[in-house]
Amino acid sequence: LCPQSKPMGGFARTSPSYETPYKADDAMGKNGWGEGYTFPCLFRNGDKGWILISETGVDSKYCGSRLLGHENGLYTIGFPQEGEMNGNGTTAPGLALPGETPWRTVTLGETLAPIVETTVSFDVVKPLYEASGKYEYGRGSWSWIIGMDGSTKYEEQLRYIDFSAAMGYQSVLVDALWDTQIGYDKVEKLAKYGAEKGVGLYLWYNSNGYWNDAPQSPRGIMDNAIARRKEMKWMQSIGIRGIKVDFFGGDKQVTMQ
């Protein structure tokens, strides 16, 4: 189980950020750090097997939820905390009738195989739109996990493109600060170099509007429709494979919107 953290804490007030440590083999009847647990939640039913409880199909018509623990092994659905999104937005969703909630799924398995292999989170959800092509993530490399912000440099990303190509990987994730430490012009060169080797690029973006203090850039783009469309057009023109958006402000409906 992954405890839900209190809002507006941690690095640059970015919590709850779904980065708290998992607690293995914890006792029933607890409530994490007092705020419940983040989905998905995995339970072991003695020697009988495993139970995975999760949520899927959350969109702008509702909010994301968490699992609240009570005494005697009772767990209930909980709405977002009031302080999320810097206090902006309501904790309860506004839902027009007729309406529907997101799916809450329960997956059972005598072993962990059905838990790992289940596709129920995709099976019950209808696509919101028809994709313009067949998209596959594949395998990739990522310099930040070792070198952090300082590794987002042109020469280092060239090295990671070469590494991905040598390993037969399909991509490289270029993380935070690429806009200032590499620059848009050189990102285009990286994308072209990667394409020649069969390696696509993912670019990192800060989700920030007003909901936390995380300074890493690019920021002020993904929360603005006009800026976002312009950026997407540029990425499409140079063959960027996808994006990683970081520092979401919480699970309120305003975030989903």
Model-assigned labels for residue ranges:
Residues 20-43, 154-160, 164, 220, ...:
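A broadly tuned preference for mixed-charge, low-complexity surface segments
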Residues 176-257:
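Aromatic- and carboxylate-enriched substrate-binding clefts and catalytic-loop regions
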Residues 1-123:
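N-terminal accessory beta-strand-rich subdomains and adjacent acidic, glycine-rich linkers
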Residues 97-171:
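An acidic-aromatic substrate-binding cleft motif
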Residues 4, 11, 142-145, 178, ...:
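Tryptophan-centered motif/residue detector
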Residues 91-94, 160-161, 190, 231-232:
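Generic recognition of flexible, low-complexity loop/linker segments
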Residues 15-28, 146, 183, 214, ...:
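Noncatalytic linker/hinge segments flanking ATPase motor cores
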